[in-house]
Amino acid sequence: MKNKHSKIIIWILAALSPILCAVTYPFLPQQVPMHWDINGTVSYEGKATFIFMAVLPLLLAGLFIYLPKIDPRKKNYAKFSKYYDYFCMFMMVFLLIANLVVVSESFFPGRISVGIVIQMLVGVLFLFLGNMMPKF
């Protein structure tokens, strides 16, 4: 990551999920929706799984920052560092939205069409990646 501001933004975005978890955890039901199949059927997990979902962005942010340092072809990151930063930020936002959906569905089941939200997010990810890849 070339830009120091990008690192800060990525860490802030990654920290929002654990903050969301800390604020909502005491009020969550014992079973939290974690998985939606292709038909929209919900699988429920214990609250401990939600903690992992909240910590995952922090782990990925650390990995995204550490990977360019250990990659044998680390000099190639200079070619696409701006887009790498954007990708990292997008993934943090993606995971934050996923956590928000889980919290919303925990408190108000059926309020959000999870399949449509995830399809839109994956579609935006492919648009972003398809637009970015020809540039490096």
What do these predicted regions represent?
Residues 2-32, 37-136:
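Feature 926 captures the class I aminoacyl-tRNA synthetase adenylation module centered on the KMSKS loop
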